Structures are given as structure tokens and as C-alpha cells.
Curated annotation (Swiss-Prot):
This is Pyridoxal kinase PdxY. SUPFAM superfamilies: Ribokinase-like. It comes from the Bacteria. Gene3D superfamilies: 3.40.1190.20. The keyword Membrane does not apply. ATP binds at D112, A144, E149, K182, R209, P210, L211, V212. Pyridoxal kinase involved in the salvage pathway of pyridoxal 5'-phosphate (PLP). Catalyzes the phosphorylation of pyridoxal to PLP in vivo, but shows very low activity compared to PdxK. Displays a low level of pyridoxine kinase activity when overexpressed, which is however not physiologically relevant. The gene is pdxY.
């Protein structure tokens, strides 16, 4: 059965971030994506200027009411949330999650707790980080912080892989069954590799791939693609190891394609065949 995912995150008209980054790769893996946009901007914010607007929180709820009115909400297998335009949007998203789970008790909530990196040009509204700590985390089935977001969620520093696994299990004690640490950065084993962890109460998997050097301007949307693809693989029944290995390879294919084409925006369309069938392989290690 084809899986249906309600994806609630940002949208850019030009380029790739949020739904504009994740939607096509998720579809290329065989999932139906229902994109619901928290913001519509001309382009992503790392350009330093953009136009567009944040959607009113009620807009999100209204759209989902419309899907419920045609009796299709029970076919939704998961809700994915990413970049929020406001903390109030987060409250509405949790209401949507409750509504989806009432219609389909098997549905999952995947929270990508985007909290902003001012130095990277990713800006989030006041209250969004607090929303994720207090409400998003306990409501989620799967949560996918990067290292900075992991430290905010567990409220202490994380300095190495062992501490990251323990921190992920602290989050699991508060609600989610699965934690993806989608960029270990300085807490990883190696400074010249890109490393991730996938953790449950009784399993922990580590994977690494080469860093792709883009100089000063790193492409945006890598985390959005990573979260979306992981959710698709898990819904399709992949094991933790299989899901982590495929996602790591697929994202690497997008990165090397983007660099080879000398582009700043992720080249998800050009890399589409290698998203579905990656040419590279990276092996996950059980910790």
C-alpha cells in the first residue's frame, strides 16, 4: 500500500527548502505527500532577503478540516512537521496530529524540531524552541534533532557519541520511540565525516559518510530531505539499519550531484534516480 504523509513545513517558490526540498524525494521513494505549507517565501532565508508570508495558524487547521470533510483523513499514515512560522502554528499542528490519530490510530507523528541557526541564516520565531521542548517532543513518535537541537531538548551539553545516545534515550523517556540525531557535528567520532545516529530504547545505530565541501555557502534543506526520506523508509517497513543506510546514501547522492553541477540549491530532480537507487553505500554500525 502506498503511504500517505501530511507534510507541514515551509515552502519556497524558488529553490529547495522545507517541503520544496523534501516533497519530491519522498515521492520518488514511492510515498504520497500532502504538502501543507507553514510559510510561503520567495526563496530560503540564507540569501539574506526574501518576500512572502507566514501562514496564519488557523489556515493549517482549516486545510485539514477540508480533508476531513471529504473523509480522507483516515488514509493519512503520518504527519511530518518541520519549520514553523510561529509557536502558535505548533499548537495547531498538535491539534492536527490528534485529529489524524483519532481518524487513524496507527498514524505516526514525525517532528523535525527546527530551532534555527542565526549564524547559518536560519531564523525562527520567538517561542518555537520552547514549543518543541514542552509540547512537540512529548507528542512525537519520531523526532529528528541536529546536535544543537538535541542539546536544547535534553537541556544539557552533548560532547560525544556516547553522550548523544544517552541524550536520545532521555528524549525517548519523554514520548518518542525513535530519535534521529541528524548531524552529530563536533560530537561525532571524526571531524571530516558527516555522522548520524538512529536510536530507540534498545537499539542505537551510527553511520557516517564523507562531508561534501561547498565552502562558505552550505546548501539548505539537507535536514528536511533527511527527515522526509527516513519517515518514508520506516513507514514502508524498513528496519532501522536499512532506513538509515538508504537515507544516508540518497542524501549523499543529492549532495555530490549538487556539487558536480556547481549549484547552491539542492539538485533533487537531477539526482532523482540515485535517490531511489543510490550508487554509493554506507554501512551503519550497531552501538
Amino acid at each position: 500500500m502506498m503511504k500517505n504523509i501530511l507534510a507541514i513545513q515551509s515552502h519556497v517558490v524558488y529553490g529547495h527548502a522545507g517541503n520544496s526540498a523534501a516533497e519530491f524525494p519522498m515521492r520518488r521513494l514511492g510515498a504520497n505527500v500532502w504538502p501543507l505549507n507553514t510559510v510561503q517565501f520567495s526563496n530560503h532565508t540564507q540569501y539574506g532577503k526574501w518576500t512572502g508570508c507566514v501562514m496564519p495558524p488557523s489556515h493549517l487547521t482549516e486545510i485539514v478540516q477540508g480533508i476531513a470533510a471529504i473523509d480522507k483523513l483516515h488514509t493519512c499514515d503520518a504527519v511530518l512537521s518541520g519549520y514553523l512560522g510561529s509557536a502558535e502554528q505548533g499548537e495547531h499542528i498538535l491539534g492536527i496530529v490528534r485529529q489524524v490519530k483519532a481518524a487513524n490510530p496507527q498514524a505516526k507523528y514525525f517532528c523535525d524540531p527546527v530551532m534555527g541557526h542565526p549564524e547559518k541564516g536560519c531564523i525562527v520565531a520567538p517561542g518555537v524552541a520552547e514549543f518543541h521542548v514542552r509540547h512537540g517532543l512529548p507528542a512525537s513518535d519520531i523526532i529528528a534533532p541536529n546536535l544543537v537541537e538535541l542539546e536544547i531538548l535534553c537541556e544539557h551539553a552533548v560532547n560525544n557519541v556516547e553522550e548523544a545516545v544517552l541524550a536520545a534515550r532521555e528524549l525517548i523517556a519523554q514520548g518518542p520511540q525513535i530519535v534521529l540525531v541528524k548531524h552529530l557535528a563536533r560530537a561525532g567520532y571524526s571531524r571530516d565525516r558527516f555522522e548520524m545516529l538512529l536510536v530507540t530504547a534498545d537499539e542505537a545505530w551510527h553511520i557516517s559518510r564523507p562531508l561534501v565541501d561547498f565552502g562558505m555557502r552550505q546548501p539548505v534543506g539537507v535536514g528536511d530531505v533527511t527527515s522526509g526520506l527516513l519517515l518514508v523508509k520506516l513507514l514502508q517497513g524498513a528496519t532501522l539499519q536499512e532506513a538509515l543506510e538508504h537515507v544516508t546514501a540518497a542524501v549523499y547522492e543529492i549532495m555530490v550531484t549538487t556539487k558536480a553541477m556547481q549549484e547552491y540549491e539542492l539538485q533533487v530532480v537531477a539526482a532523482q534516480d540515485r535517490i531511489a537507487k543510490p550508487e554509493h553505500y554506507f554501512s551503519a554500525t550497531k552501538l
